[in-house]
Design a protein with these regions (language model features):
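Conserved adenine-nucleotide phosphate-binding loops and their immediately adjacent elements
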Residues: 59-72
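Pre-Walker A adenine-sensing motif
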Residues: 70-87
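Walker A/P-loop nucleotide-binding motif
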Residues: 87-109, 123-124
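Sensor-1/coupling segment of RecA-like P-loop NTPase cores
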Residues: 94-99, 184-211
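A short helix-turn-beta junction within AAA+ P-loop NTPase domains corresponding to the substrate/partner-engaging
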Residues: 115-117, 207-226
Length: 293
C-alpha cells in the first residue's frame, strides 16, 4: 500500500505532513486523509506522486555516491591565488574564461574558507539598483532608499572591514553597475573580484573607454582560457570516481570542460547504480553522445 510506503519514508527522513504537502502540491488535509486511509475518492493520483517521490529519492541516493568535493587543481589554485591577493591587498582582480571551467566553484570554495568574503551572483535582470540592494543585504547594510543612500550604507559597512567583494557572472553588469563597484572599492579599499566570461574584459574597457577609471584599477586578470589542461581533468575525474581507470575515456569525451565532465560522470554513476552494472568505457561513450554541452 503506497500510503504505508509514504509513512515509512516520512519516518525515516523525519518529514512532516506539511513538507509532503508542499512536494505534492496539495493541502495538508489531503496528505492527512491519504495517510489515514480516509481520502474520499480514488487515490491513484496520490499513489503516483508517492512513486515519483521515492524515485527522486533513489536518484539522490545514487548522486550521493558521486564525490563532488572541491578539487584543488592547478587552475583552481590560480584562481584562489588571485582572490587571496585581491583580499589581502584591497585590489580589483579579474577571473575570466569560457563557461564550465570552474569559476563559480572557485568562488564558492573561497567563501567556505573565508567568512569575510562576499559572493554576489548576478543575472541578466540585475540593474544597478538590484545590484546595490544585493550587496547591501549581504553585508547587513540598509537596502532601502535611492541608489546613493544604499551606496552610502554599503560604504559605511565595508570601510575598514577588509572584506572581499566577489561578483559572479560579472559580464552581465551594465556600465553603471560597474561604476558602482569601482566607487565601492575607491571609498572602502575593499578587495574586488570580477568573474565571468571572456567578454568581461572587453566590458571593463567600455565601448568608448568610458570605464577607463575602473580598468586602470584592475591589478591582475586571470585568464582560464577555453579548456582545462588534461592534468586538471584527470584530478577531477579521479576524485569524483575514486579511480583513474576511466580517465582516458572521460577526458576524450569531456572536451576540456569541467562541467561537461561532471555531467558525464554523474550520468554514468547513476546509470551503473540503477542498472546494477559496472561503469565501462562503452557506457561513457554512450552517455557522451547525449550531452549537449
Amino acid at each position: 500500500m503506497k500510503a504505508q510506503e509514504l509513512k515509512t519514508f516520512m519516518d525515516a527522513h523525519k518529514m512532516s505532513q506539511k513538507q509532503v504537502a508542499t512536494l505534492f502540491d496539495v493541502s495538508i488535509t489531503t496528505v492527512s486523509q491519504y495517510l489515514n486511509g480516509k481520502y474520499p475518492t480514488d487515490t491513484k493520483w496520490l499513489d503516483e506522486k508517492v512513486n515519483e517521490l521515492l524515485a527522486r529519492h533513489k536518484a539522490k541516493v545514487v548522486e550521493a555516491k558521486y564525490n563532488n568535493a572541491f578539487v584543488p587543481t592547478q587552475t583552481a589554485k590560480r584562481g584562489m591565488e588571485i582572490m587571496h591577493f585581491a583580499h589581502a591587498e584591497g585590489e580589483i582582480n579579474v577571473i575570466y574564461g569560457a563557461a564550465g571551467l570552474g569559476k563559480t566553484q572557485m568562488l564558492k570554495q573561497y567563501a567556505k574558507e573565508h567568512s569575510s568574503a562576499i559572493l554576489i551572483e548576478v543575472d541578466p535582470s540585475c540593474t544597478p539598483k538590484v545590484l546595490l540592494r544585493k550587496i547591501a543585504e549581504t553585508v547587513g547594510a540598509t537596502s532601502r532608499g535611492v541608489n546613493n543612500d544604499v551606496l552610502a550604507s554599503i560604504v559605511e559597512k565595508l570601510n575598514g572591514a577588509e572584506r572581499l567583494l566577489r561578483i559572479d557572472e560579472a559580464e552581465l553588469l551594465s556600465t553603471r553597475s560597474l561604476e558602482f563597484i569601482r566607487r565601492i572599492h575607491d571609498l572602502t579599499n575593499c578587495g574586488v573580484i570580477l568573474a565571468g566570461m571572456p567578454r568581461l574584459l572587453v566590458n571593463l574597457k567600455g565601448k568608448n573607454n568610458e570605464l577607463a577609471q575602473l580598468y586602470s584599477r584592475v591589478g591582475f586578470a586571470c585568464d582560464l582560457g577555453n579548456a582545462l589542461p588534461e592534468s586538471d581533468l584527470a584530478m577531477l575525474a579521479e576524485s569524483a570516481l575514486n579511480t583513474s581507470e576511466f580517465n582516458a575515456a572521460l577526458l576524450k569525451a569531456c572536451k576540456g570542460n569541467a562541467r561537461r565532465l561532471s555531467k558525464l560522470m554523474r550520468g554514468v554513476v547513476r546509470s551503473a547504480e540503477i542498472n546494477e552494472t559496472e561503469i565501462s568505457a562503452e557506457m561513457i561513450e554512450q552517455y557522451s553522445k547525449m550531452l549537449i554541452s
